[in-house]
Amino acid sequence: MSPKTETKASVGFKAGVKDYKLTYYTPDYETKDTDILAAFRVTPQPGVPPEEAGAAVAAESSTGTWTTVWTDGLTSLDRYKGRCYHIEPVAGEEDQYIAYVAYPLDLFEEGSVTNMFTSIVGNVFGFKALRALRLEDLRIPTAYVKTFQGPPHGIQVERDKLNKYGRPLLGCTIKPKLGLSAKNYGRAVYECLRGGLDFTKDDENVNSQPFMRWRDRFLFCAEALYKAQAETGEIKGHYLNATAGTCEEMMKRAVFARELGVPIVMHDYLTGGFTANTTLAHYCRDNGLLLHIHRAMHAVIDRQKNHGIHFRVLAKALRMSGGDHIHAGTVVGKLEGERDITLGFVDLLRDDFIQKDRSRGIYFTQDWVSMPGVLPVASGGIHVWHMPALTEIFGDDSVLQFGGGTLGHPWGNAPGAVANRVALEACVQARNEGRDLAREGNEIIREACKWSPELAAACEVWKEIKFEFKAVDTLDIL
């Protein structure tokens, strides 16, 4: 290098490492309506100040890297950088902080959940200066929301398609989840739908295995639901899982489902990926298919309180990517889910405008600007004794899904479906009459048993079954 070049470089660019907080911690910054806002739970390594940790998150998830680079001078970092604009300690937790970060909208590709997550959570979670990091919530600005199609149809359109109003929808996951032949699988589907359920479902890991190839399953399930429809006069559906090893194969399965004339298909959106999910959601809107979403693998990401991504963020991402149903926990069943937290993200799925409410874990006000809503699905370890609580907790705009709670009935699949339908109708009628489901739930179910032997048998089988474990992911002390 010539002396002349050295002089010019030293004037325009100073190499070396500097603290992130000098550039990316900006407590005086006023957030813009177009910013994506993030709330991170940050646990710094010993000796790392919280301001430096928060700034590091902002830097590494936007324009920064570990050292100064001369190409910084070729762009406007002030325009494009993420900013940590506020930090607060977490009450009752040692060395944990909530760091609020604002990202300029120009950092993100329009209509791409994949790109949004690649930026915000793609690399920073392995950063050595942090012991742990969790993305608690995102505020998606309306300008960005409007770049997404969202759910293929939404709650009201689904009800109109099914001609079912004024109650939760009822479903059942076919069990055993693996090992049945396609014909026996279709038989179970028919019996459950004939007994009074609205939907039956492929389990999340039912794809196209040697014991039951996808095309055979689709054909037998279509035959089952058409037969049940003809006999009951109700529109029925089975969630045909289109998840596959490639996007091309996934779309081939969705096209075949449409050709069969069935109303709904299914996708495992986390294992399948957001790009595949958005592709399928667009196809479903264009071709009149409803889309059921399973959240398989979510607990790997969201269950630990100090590290990962909270499910409320994954729920928002799903609403943007597209899905008409998504599993959302039960509060009362076998799967993780504290009541206030669950109801917080249920509102984020269904409602058009949700106010900030830290008592339910909602860090930001969210405006969906008329994007269709998503039906939450309660599924996992629930049975007829849970029906009053589920109806009271989730309300009409939900899907209550009983797998073992249908197929485990001592008299068979169809009586199991009858028991669930009778229990639901009894709870809805009692609620509409002004009775308190939370206080009188067991009494309401016992009264219904008097005129439904199927329900009475189910109540006897599951009268002692409870899943009483403390939730791992709980709300912070405010």
UniProtKB/Swiss-Prot annotation:
The lineage of its organism: Eukaryota, Viridiplantae, Streptophyta, Embryophyta, Tracheophyta. RuBisCO catalyzes two reactions: the carboxylation of D-ribulose 1,5-bisphosphate, the primary event in carbon dioxide fixation, as well as the oxidative fragmentation of the pentose substrate in the photorespiration process. Both reactions occur simultaneously and in competition at the same active site. This is Ribulose bisphosphate carboxylase large chain. Heterohexadecamer of 8 large chains and 8 small chains; disulfide-linked. The disulfide link is formed within the large subunit homodimers. The keyword Plastid applies. It comes from Drimys granadensis. Belongs to the RuBisCO large chain family. Type I subfamily. Its EC number is 4.1.1.39. The gene is rbcL. Residues 1-2 form a propeptide. The record marks K334 as: Transition state stabilizer. Its main location: plastid. Its cofactor is Mg(2+). Keywords: Acetylation, Calvin cycle, Carbon dioxide fixation, Chloroplast, Disulfide bond, Lyase, Magnesium, Metal-binding, Methylation, Monooxygenase, Oxidoreductase, Photorespiration, Photosynthesis, Plastid. One of its GO terms (biological process) is photorespiration. Binds 1 Mg(2+) ion per subunit. The modification N-acetylproline is found at P3. GO terms for molecular function: magnesium ion binding; monooxygenase activity; ribulose-bisphosphate carboxylase activity.
